[in-house]
């Protein structure tokens, strides 16, 4: 096939060629601009994903249990040396083992063997020496009490029969000690029902079905409704209270465990929702007029009480920002300021002061404002394209700065009111044991079981804070007389 001659483009005029090149240049510039915008978006997204991967319990609100097992624990940079020596401190109560005056068994060790002269030592007159040693052991055994009734005939001829005491209702049943021990294991020691039944059978030969253990918990919860209701009403009257919430698996679905607490009182409630509907249904915060310490969850802001925010959360967020951009100095300065203020409040309480000196408070507030003003220069507000009404996502640093600035009084409440703690660790500690229950058992099979757990745990946690024997309290509960916690 003959080769086709090349197509010859007619020559362009200089003006036409210039116009074409300008159009191509404009198109290429537009493409470069689009690519640059895409690169910027991708870099921003990569930064967000890297920051998300770098988050763990030391720089975010993630729990320590979510940290990778292969990751080395971070250094406790915020923990300052206390100056105390390791081990037990001077004048602490301790738990030294001491001899008891009335041992259950006494064993006198006889002489044995023969003397060098050949006489048998068993025939030698002896006297007890003052030295004695005691071995403490644990004996767990079943104790069965049998009740029998009697009948008698009065002189008038009327027949009388004795009656069984209250609580002895069946031919064979378990006493308050067994029920109290089972509930203590499931609701305080966090054992599952099956393992509780196994332990009772192993230790004491008492054969319980897991369903029986569950029924004992339901009975205890029914008997403790009044004391736990009183605990909730007492919390409403407190000057400072802590609140928190956490997810709970109930009947295969996500529900929420809410806690309201102080150093001496604890109230738990389970609800299907986390926010305002749940708090309204629980019904305590509507009557609360003190200072509520929490982690800035928006549902709490609807209540008219005073608020204080958890600064442990703020410290973790500041650490995350500092690690994301090591060149920034303001996160470290703000961390140092908050820790300095916290230390000042500890020293003031130890000295018996009712408040920090006014000049110190003013200085802390001034330095706080200066640091946030400086921080805002490095993290300006993001804006969208001209004419766009779409909300632009802001950086975590910008959001934190805005929150710390707009809610300065709530963040620094611990400075102006020494009754208020620096953080919300009280509520987080009270949340920890129910979370352990979920880790051990995987969740609750029914909503009734979860609510029973909340009632019993409220009671036991409160008694524990007040140094009351929780087992004996449960025993008295099954006897119909649950001890009332101190509510003042």
Stretches with model-predicted labels:
Residues 1-172, 243, 294:
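Short, flexible loop/hinge motifs at secondary-structure junctions
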Residues 2-8, 12, 33, 40-41, ...:
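Catalytic center-proximal scaffold of phosphoryl-transfer enzymes
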């Amino acid at each position: 096939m003959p080769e086709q001659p090349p197509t010859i483009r007619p020559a362009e005029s200089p003006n036409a060629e210039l116009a074409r090149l300008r159009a191509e240049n404009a198109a290429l510039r537009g493409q470069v601009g689009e690519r640059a915008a895409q690169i910027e978006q991708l870099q921003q997204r990569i930064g967000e994903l890297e920051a998300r991967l770098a988050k763990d319990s030391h720089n975010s609100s993630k729990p320590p249990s979510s940290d990778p097992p292969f990751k080395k624990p971070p250094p406790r940079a915020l923990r300052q040396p206390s100056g105390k020596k390791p081990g037990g401190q001077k004048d602490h109560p301790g738990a030294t083992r001491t001899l008891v005056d009335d041992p259950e068994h006494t064993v006198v060790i006889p002489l044995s063997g023969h003397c060098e002269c050949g006489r048998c030592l068993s025939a030698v007159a002896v006297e007890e020496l003052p030295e004695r040693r005691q071995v403490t052991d644990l004996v767990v055994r079943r104790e069965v009490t049998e009740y029998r009734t009697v009948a008698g005939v009065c002189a008038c001829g009327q027949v009388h029969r004795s009656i069984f005491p209250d609580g002895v209702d069946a031919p064979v049943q378990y006493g308050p000690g067994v029920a109290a021990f089972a509930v203590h294991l499931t609701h305080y020691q966090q054992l599952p029902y099956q393992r509780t039944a196994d332990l009772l059978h192993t230790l004491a030969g008492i054969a319980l079905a897991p369903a029986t253990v569950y029924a004992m918990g339901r009975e205890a919860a029914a008997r403790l409704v009044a004391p736990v209701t009183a605990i909730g009403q007492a919390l409403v009257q407190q000057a400072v209270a802590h609140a928190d919430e956490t997810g709970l698996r109930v009947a295969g679905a996500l529900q929420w465990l809410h806690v309201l607490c102080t150093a001496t009182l604890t109230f738990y409630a389970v609800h299907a929702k986390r926010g305002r509907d749940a708090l309204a249904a629980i019904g305590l915060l509507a009557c609360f007029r003190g200072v509520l310490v929490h982690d800035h969850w928006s549902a709490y802001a609807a209540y008219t009480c005073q608020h204080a925010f958890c600064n442990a959360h703020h410290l973790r967020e500041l650490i995350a920002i500092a690690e994301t951009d090591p060149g920034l100095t303001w996160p470290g300065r703000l961390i140092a300021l908050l820790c300095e203020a916290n230390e000042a409040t500890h020293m003031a309480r130890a000295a018996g002061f009712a408040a920090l000196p006014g000049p110190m408070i003013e200085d802390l507030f001034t330095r706080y404002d200066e640091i946030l003003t400086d921080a805002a220069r490095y993290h300006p507000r993001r804006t969208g394209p001209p004419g766009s009404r779409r909300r632009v996502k802001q950086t975590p640093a910008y959001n934190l700065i805005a929150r710390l600035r707009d809610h300065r009084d709530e963040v620094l409440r611990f400075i102006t009111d020494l009754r208020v703690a620096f953080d919300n660790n009280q509520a987080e500690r009270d949340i920890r044991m129910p979370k352990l229950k979920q880790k051990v058992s995987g969740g609750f099979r029914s909503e009734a079981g979860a609510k029973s757990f909340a009632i019993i745990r409220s009671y036991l946690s409160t008694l524990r804070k007040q140094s009351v024997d929780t087992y004996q309290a449960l025993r008295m509960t099954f006897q119909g007389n649950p001890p009332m916690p101190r509510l003042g």
